[in-house]
Amino acid sequence: MIDADGFRANVGIILANTQGQVLWAKRIGHNAWQFPQGGIDRGETPMDAMYRELWEEVGLHPRHVDLLAVTQDWLRYRLPKRYVRHGQYPLCIGQKQKWFLLRLDEPNTQHIRFDEGKPEFDNWQWVSYWYPLGQVIHFKRSVYRRALQELVPELPLQQGLIIPEQNNHLLVE
């Protein structure tokens, strides 16, 4: 669903383990890594979309995870001009996202799979909480930063995690 301003409603998923690491997934056919995310279908709530995307993209059911937090507001990013499809209506100029922080206990890691529906990822790894800031494609970076900063207080294990300064992409373990 694209709103009147041209932003597609979307959910993002930060899936953390009990050590505070997050699932980082590699897109099929690309050397591009990101958090799982996906559009909200007509009639769906953001929560419904998050659980659907969790199943479609990662193979996990709600029973495998604990919901820790959700961003308060929609976080928006604009697509670079080369990614805007000018021949489509309504015109989508970016995404507005609700971000969800989920916890996955180690025994449920065995349920992670990328063979449901139309797979979008072909590999994954656990990375430190702030690692994605230095790796995600540039136009998503500020949304990732805002989501990670807002949600970090809800992580069960925060020892040693430090919120980076605005321009600092160094990793802190």
Swiss-Prot record:
Keywords (A to Z) from UniProt: Hydrolase
Highest rank taxon of the organism: Bacteria
Residue intervals of the Nudix hydrolase domain: 6-149
Chain positions of motif Nudix box: 38-59
Name of the gene: rppH
InterPro entries: Nudix_hydrolase, NUDIX_hydrolase-like_dom_sf, NUDIX_hydrolase_CS, NUDIX_hydrolase_dom, RppH
EC identifiers of the protein: 3.6.1.-
Family per similarity comment: Belongs to the Nudix hydrolase family. RppH subfamily.
Function as written in the Swiss-Prot or TrEMBL entry: Accelerates the degradation of transcripts by removing pyrophosphate from the 5'-end of triphosphorylated RNA, leading to a more labile monophosphorylated state that can stimulate subsequent ribonuclease cleavage.
NCBIfam families, A to Z: PRK00714.1-1, PRK00714.1-4, PRK00714.1-5
UniProt-recorded name of the protein: RNA pyrophosphohydrolase
Keyword Hydrolase applies: yes
Species per Swiss-Prot/TrEMBL record: Psychrobacter cryohalolentis (strain ATCC BAA-1226 / DSM 17306 / VKM B-2378 / K5)
